From Swiss-Prot:
One of its GO terms (cellular component) is cytochrome b6f complex. The 4 large subunits of the cytochrome b6-f complex are cytochrome b6, subunit IV (17 kDa polypeptide, PetD), cytochrome f and the Rieske protein, while the 4 small subunits are PetG, PetL, PetM and PetN. The complex functions as a dimer. This is Cytochrome b6-f complex subunit 6. The chain crosses the membrane at residues 4-24. GO terms for molecular function: electron transporter, transferring electrons within cytochrome b6/f complex of photosystem II activity. InterPro entries: Cyt_b6/f_cplx_su6. Belongs to the PetL family. GO terms for biological process: photosynthesis. The keyword Transmembrane helix applies. Component of the cytochrome b6-f complex, which mediates electron transfer between photosystem II (PSII) and photosystem I (PSI), cyclic electron flow around PSI, and state transitions. PetL is important for photoautotrophic growth as well as for electron transfer efficiency and stability of the cytochrome b6-f complex. It is a single-pass membrane protein.
């Protein structure tokens, strides 16, 4: 059970990082 929760937590962190990077790149392109 602990491995499943940690796996989902890792996926959540990766998703947040990728989304933030994508938003940052789009903002730089707009500027």
């Amino acid at each position: 059970m602990l491995t499943i929760t940690s796996y989902f937590g890792f996926l959540l962190v990766v998703l947040i990082i990728t989304s933030s990077l994508f938003i940052g790149l789009s903002k730089i392109r707009l500027i």
